[in-house]
């Protein structure tokens, strides 16, 4: 009898432990698979593609790749002597037409004062027309001078904001064309996280919700806030043919891949360029408040760590 009781007790204890383990594993699995999280997240930043507004030979490059620069710091300089001469020529034209306009103004004024008693109306009108033509040429010369001055100013390429120079691919002696990208500037203090959440998890994602960001290869957990959720993504299953008719791709009803929607997350603290734009991270949306990690069970902590590996 005692042996039977002992066997039943062992069986009951084993059964209870198995049930508890199953419940714990099930809860961890649900937390792991259904909570709003994704490993498909990337650090992003505001990037300015810097291109000159003038063409010419690059005479000086004042920075090196990956350098932190300040706003208005000189990055490189384009052939200034050519644009200085263009400005001098434009200023000479302005000076010439100013003198000519003064002469024609005096001539027209003299004829207007004498009137038709001394000369014909045609001669008076001709003097006034010549004055208007010269004034028009003067205005055109002044506009050309202003453009030449602007071009000269833009031979010096400056940083539009504080940030890091990256992908610098220009060197002194090269010819650069107008509008061609010379360097990219990653703006300082503009980093954020772009998380691509599955549509099945968007119910738990709202602007203002808190988020945890774990950079790939790091045990450090950053904090952030959901800034916005994209209003739409491209429908790859539907296109238009040459006549504008809709073309719908065939689909298997029992296989449905969840679409991923971009979610922008604002970081609580900027980390400089410790995690460059484009690097990956794991994002967990914790809801309206931050998660208290100290209260997590072993299985919850295990599930949280498993997110790093898939």
From Swiss-Prot:
Q: Give the HAMAP family listed for this entry.
A: AaeA
Family matches, as InterPro entries? CusB-like_dom_1, CusB_D23, MFP_Efflux_Pump, PHBA_efflux_pump_AaeA, RND_pump_MFP
Q: Name one Pfam family in it.
A: CusB_dom_1
Primary location group: membrane
**Could you tell me what this protein is called?**
p-hydroxybenzoic acid efflux pump subunit AaeA
Q: Name one GO molecular function term.
A: transmembrane transporter activity
What role does it play?
Forms an efflux pump with AaeB.
A GO term from the CC aspect: plasma membrane
Q: Which UniProt keywords apply?
A: Cell inner membrane, Cell membrane, Membrane, Transmembrane, Transmembrane helix, Transport
Subcellular location(s) of the protein: Cell inner membrane
Record carries keyword Metal-binding: no
